[in-house]
Amino acid sequence: MSQAYSSSQRVSSYRRTFGGAPGFPLGSPLSSPVFPRAGFGSKGSSSSVTSRVYQVSRTSGGAGGLGSLRASRLGTTRTPSSYGAGELLDFSLADAVNQEFLTTRTNEKVELQELNDRFANYIEKVRFLEQQNAALAAEVNRLKGREPTRVAELYEEELRELRRQVEVLTNQRARVDVERDNLLDDLQRLKAKLQEEIQLKEEAENNLAAFRADVDAATLARIDLERRIESLNEEIAFLKKVHEEEIRELQAQLQEQQVQVEMDMSKPDLTAALRDIRAQYETIAAKNISEAEEWYKSKVSDLTQAANKNNDALRQAKQEMMEYRHQIQSYTCEIDALKGTNDSLMRQMRELEDRFASEASGYQDNIARLEEEIRHLKDEMARHLREYQDLLNVKMALDVEIATYRKLLEGEESRINLPIQTYSALNFRETSPEQRGSEVHTKKTVMIKTIETRDGEVVSEATQQQHEVL
């Protein structure tokens, strides 16, 4: 072959390592292509075939750059070969290079297909997560917009109903308390009146006892006077008898004296003396009888008047006592009726208090249950918000990872689509491993998103980015 064969072949292999964290920088090494270069002399000349192997790495100096290609010479092999006119060329090295190139291209196709499959699966997963995220966001918005409002309306409505019932029960209790106070006032007034009536009864009984003592004293005085009257009557009768006896004796004496006068006419003054004595005795007896009768009549009249007065007072006291007894009986019946009414009202009040306490406890249980439901809904909302925040973080991480993969794919596509002449025209500069290690750097971006919630509602949301150069 008279024309020198000089071409640049590109041998590259895609070796990527995907980690679990989504924020891998773009500056990680992606491939290590090997660039063989063979030089063939012309016919009739002696030349050497030189092949150099370069290690190319992609580094990123920023967040979105495609990177730069760096090549370092690993070794040089020289194979002497002389071609003359009419001599057979040795294509063993070219065949080996072509075979290696075909193998590398086949491996690259397989790896590209696997990467495409993985990327398609990853995109499907991202779409699924986005759908889940949208569904969760819609559910969060629905819960945020409807459920708390409905629960709040139900809670407020039930609370208003409970307050209305409490007001009704409070009014009923106030009315019952007023009635009870009125009944207690009536009872106190009746008790005071009863005490007054009891005092009046005691005074009447004391007066009656005093009147009884007076009546007894009057009765005793009357009996004494009756006895004295009887004794006086007996004395009068006795005096009458004595007077009659004396009169009879005097008459007998007078008769004897008359006989003696008749017989003896010498005593004419005796009859006159007897007549004077009889007259004196009759006058004295009549005076005594009249005085005794007047005294007896006056005493009997006084005793009769006192007895009548005492009988009238006793009858009046008995009548008042009967009236007091009737009043006491009526007051006792009224007090018993008021006691029964008070007992029934107290029983109704206790029943109302028990029912009010049971209803209040039931309302408190309902309020506690509603508050527990509200707290549970708030916890559910907070949990959904946390899940939503986690999904947002995952989405952001996935977006960053997708952008990273997109930039990687764009860089690889731009690198693959470059013509071979571009790679042959590259000015590879040889660097040492120490210089490569000092020049290779990566940039790591960490995004921190802070969402503050209060009572299940988003209060504030802040995003912070931190850049680290590795």
Swiss-Prot record:
Residues 152-252 are annotated as: Coil 1B. Residues 296-412 are annotated as: Coil 2B. It comes from Homo sapiens. Residues 253-268 are annotated as: Linker 12. The modification Phosphothreonine is found at T17, T76, T77. GO terms for molecular function: cytoskeletal protein binding; identical protein binding; structural constituent of cytoskeleton. ADP-ribosylation prevents ability to form intermediate filaments. This is Desmin. Residues 413-470 are annotated as: Tail. Residues 108-416 form the IF rod domain. It comes from the Eukaryota. Residues 269-287 are annotated as: Coil 2A. Muscle-specific type III intermediate filament essential for proper muscular structure and function. Plays a crucial role in maintaining the structure of sarcomeres, inter-connecting the Z-disks and forming the myofibrils, linking them not only to the sarcolemmal cytoskeleton, but also to the nucleus and mitochondria, thus providing strength for the muscle fiber during activity. In adult striated muscle they form a fibrous network connecting myofibrils to each other and to the plasma membrane from the periphery of the Z-line structures. The modification ADP-ribosylarginine is found at R58.
